[in-house]
């Protein structure tokens, strides 16, 4: 009996699990961004800068202290994009999807945490809803990338594939990150494509779909 009481006291609430999950992902992302392989210059980025960048990516705020396109290498950009995707989907949703892929069963407590994480109305059907969110998210992001692919490949060659994928995920997760680099000491972002109907319409639809996705889940 005393052991059961101790275990109950030590059990984390859904809110605590979500907070610790986000904090853990942010810290891991910050440490990965500190690696020399994460920058184009091959140097070590100060922890305060990588922590800020990782937090911004996971919390999808779009604030940066270094230009994402020119400062970070392909590896660093991949880390940032992964953090954006995790932040957009939610740490608990990503963890649950990995558990499902590995064939593990989701416990009732885990289902309750998933319910709180995505603001689902009930625990029943939460696993099915999570699968639906994952499939829908990846499908929409893929379609967005395919729509922008011809434009970016025309301007950047094979690198356009990565450009299309990055901006599709960033837009759908409403993250505000871009990898278009610096021109004349300015950060043009997507202003260079102000006259491109394909890029403009695709980005707008991706952002709009994200907002509708959130409202439908809630």
Set out the residue ranges of the language-model regions:
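Membrane-proximal intracellular helices of multi-pass ion channels
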Residues: 1-218
């Amino acid at each position: 009996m005393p052991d059961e009481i101790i275990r109950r006291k030590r059990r984390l609430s859904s809110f605590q699990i979500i907070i610790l999950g986000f904090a853990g992902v942010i810290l891991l992302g910050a440490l990965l961004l500190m690696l020399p392989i994460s920058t184009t210059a091959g140097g070590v980025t100060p922890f305060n800068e990588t922590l800020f960048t990782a937090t911004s990516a996971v919390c999808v705020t779009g604030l940066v202290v270094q230009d994402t396109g020119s400062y970070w290498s392909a590896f660093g950009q991949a880390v940032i994009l992964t953090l954006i995707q995790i932040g957009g989907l939610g740490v608990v949703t990503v963890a649950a999807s990995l558990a499902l892929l590995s064939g593990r069963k989701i416990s009732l407590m885990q289902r309750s945490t998933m319910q709180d994480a995505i603001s689902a109305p009930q625990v029943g059907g939460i696993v099915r809803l999570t699968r639906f969110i994952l499939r829908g998210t990846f499908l929409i992001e893929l379609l967005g990338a395919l729509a922008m692919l011809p434009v970016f490949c025309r301007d950047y060659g094979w690198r356009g594939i990565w450009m299309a994928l990055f901006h599709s995920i960033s837009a759908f997760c409403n993250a505000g990150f871009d990898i278009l680099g610096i021109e004349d000491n300015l950060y043009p972002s997507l202003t260079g494509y102000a006259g491109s109907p394909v890029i403009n319409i695709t980005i707008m639809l991706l952002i709009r779909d994200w907002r509708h996705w959130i409202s439908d889940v809630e």
